C-alpha cells in the first residue's frame, strides 16, 4: 500500500489505529492550498484502504483550524478562472469532503478560526471537538463568493433551517458555545485541548469492533432522509453481516471471560 507523505502544507501522522491529518499553513491561518488538498486526498484514501486504521482526526497547526480559500492568493488570479482552467476538479472536491465520506469515523479537532472552507470541511466530519475560543462561519457571501464546499446543501441538513440560513446569508461568525448550542459541534473544551479530547474519542472508537463501527456509520449515511420502512431494510442487511463475522463471536466471548476483546476486523 502506498505511503501517504507529509508535506510543508499538511502533516500526516499515525498513532496506533488513528491517522492524524494536520493542515499546516499557520502563517496563512491554514488557508487551503493545492498541495494541502493533494495530501488530504491521499490521507482519505489511506484511511479507507488501510484495515489497521480505525479512525481519523483532522486538525490544524498553530492554533488555527482552517480559514478556507486563500483570498490573498485569489487577488493574483480571478477566482472564476479555476473553473475555466480545470483546477477546480474532483481532487479539490474530495479534499473538502464534498460528496465523499470516509468509511471510518472522522473527528475534527478545532482550535481558533474555522471559517468559510474551514466550516465547510467540518460538515464532512462525524464528531467535532472545539477549543472554547474557536470561531465558525461561512462568510463567502461577504466577498460575493459561493460556498463551493457544499454548505448551501448540507448545512441545513445538520442544523435547523433558520439557523443555517442565518449563517449562510449573513456570513457572520459564531463562537464555539453558539456552535454547540446549534448542534454544529458536539464538544467544547479548554483552548489547546481539542486534539487531546479528539484522541480520547478516537481511542474509545478504536477499542470497539471495527466492523460494527464501520457498519453503523454506513447505515447512518445510506439511510439518511429515507422513510423508516425503506431504511430498516438496508439497516438489517448491513447489521446481519456484522453478526456473521468472527469479531461478533469474539465480543460476547470476551465479555463472558471478563477481558478486553481482541478484534481482528473480520
Swiss-Prot record:
Pathway: Steroid metabolism; cholesterol degradation
Active site: 120, 140
Catalytic activity: (22E)-3-oxochola-4,22-dien-24-oyl-CoA + H2O = (22R)-hydroxy-3-oxo-chol-4-ene-24-oyl-CoA
Chain positions with N6-succinyllysine modification: 135, 142
UniProt cross-references to Pfam families, sorted A to Z: ECH_1 (PF00378)
Domain of life: Bacteria
Substitution effect: residue 142 to E: About 50% succinylation in vitro, reduces specific activity 7-fold
SUPFAM superfamilies in alphabetical order: ClpP/crotonase
E.C. no: 4.2.1.-
Keywords of this entry: Cholesterol metabolism, Lipid degradation, Lipid metabolism, Lyase, Steroid metabolism, Sterol metabolism
GO biological process, one term: fatty acid beta-oxidation
Record GO terms (molecular function): lyase activity
Entry keyword annotation includes Repeat: no
InterPro entries noted in UniProt: ClpP/crotonase-like_dom_sf, Enoyl-CoA_hydra/iso, Enoyl-CoA_hydra_C
PTM comment: Succinylated in vitro at pH 8.1, succinylation reduces specific activity of the enzyme 5.5-fold; succinyl-CoA is a downstream by-product of cholesterol degradation. Can be de-succinylated in vitro by NAD-dependent protein deacylase (AC P9WGG3). Succinylation may be a negative feedback regulator of cholesterol metabolism.
Keyword Lipid metabolism tagged: yes
Knockout or disruption consequences: Not required for growth in a mouse tuberculosis model. Not required for growth on cholesterol.
NCBIfam families recorded: PRK07799.1
SUBUNIT field: Homotrimer; substrate probably binds in elongated tunnels between the subunits.
Role: Degradation of the cholesterol side chain involves 3 multistep beta-oxidation cycles, this may be involved in the second cycle. Hydrates 3-OCDO-CoA ((22E)-3-oxo-chol-4,22-dien-24-oyl-CoA) to make (22R)-HOCO-CoA (3-oxo-chol-4-ene-(22R)-hydroxy-24-oyl-CoA). Also acts on octenoyl-CoA. Not active on (E)-3-OCDS-CoA ((E)-3-oxocholest-4,24-dien-26-oyl-CoA) or 3-OPDC-CoA (3-oxo-4,17-pregnadiene-20-carboxyl-CoA). Hydrates the same substrate as ChsH3, but the 2 enzymes make different stereoisomers of the product.
Family: Belongs to the enoyl-CoA hydratase/isomerase family.
Name of protein: Enoyl-CoA hydratase EchA19
Amino acid at each position: 500500500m502506498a505511503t501517504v507523505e507529509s508535506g510543508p502544507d499538511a502533516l500526516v501522522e499515525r498513532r496506533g489505529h488513528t491517522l492524524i491529518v494536520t493542515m499546516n499553513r499557520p502563517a496563512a491561518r491554514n488557508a487551503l492550498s493545492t498541495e494541502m488538498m493533494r495530501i488530504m486526498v491521499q490521507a482519505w484514501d489511506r484511511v479507507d484502504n488501510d484495515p489497521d486504521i480505525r479512525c481519523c482526526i483532522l486538525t490544524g497547526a498553530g492554533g488555527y483550524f482552517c480559514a478556507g480559500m486563500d483570498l490573498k492568493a485569489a487577488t493574483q488570479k480571478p477566482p472564476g478562472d479555476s473553473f475555466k482552467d480545470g483546477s477546480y476538479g474532483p481532487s479539490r472536491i474530495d479534499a473538502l469532503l464534498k460528496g465523499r465520506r470516509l468509511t471510518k469515523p472522522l473527528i475534527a479537532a478545532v482550535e481558533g478560526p474555522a471559517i468559510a472552507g474551514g466550516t465547510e470541511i467540518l460538515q464532512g466530519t462525524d464528531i467535532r471537538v472545539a477549543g472554547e475560543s474557536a470561531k465558525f462561519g461561512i462568510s463567502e457571501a461577504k466577498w460575493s463568493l459561493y460556498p463551493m464546499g457544499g454548505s448551501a446543501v448540507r448545512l441545513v441538513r445538520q442544523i435547523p433551517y433558520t439557523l443555517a440560513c442565518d449563517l449562510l446569508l449573513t456570513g457572520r461568525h459564531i463562537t464555539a458555545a453558539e456552535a454547540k448550542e446549534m448542534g454544529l459541534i458536539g464538544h467544547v473544551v479548554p483552548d489547546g485541548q481539542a486534539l487531546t479530547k479528539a484522541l480520547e474519542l478516537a481511542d474509545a472508537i478504536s477499542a470497539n469492533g471495527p466492523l460494527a463501527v464501520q457498519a453503523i456509520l454506513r447505515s447512518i449515511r445510506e439511510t439518511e432522509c429515507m422513510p423508516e420502512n425503506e431504511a430498516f431494510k438496508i439497516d438489517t442487511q448491513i447489521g446481519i453481516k456484522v453478526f456473521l463475522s468472527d469479531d461478533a463471536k469474539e465480543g460476547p466471548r470476551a465479555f463472558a471471560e471478563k477481558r478486553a476483546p481482541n478484534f481482528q476486523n473480520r
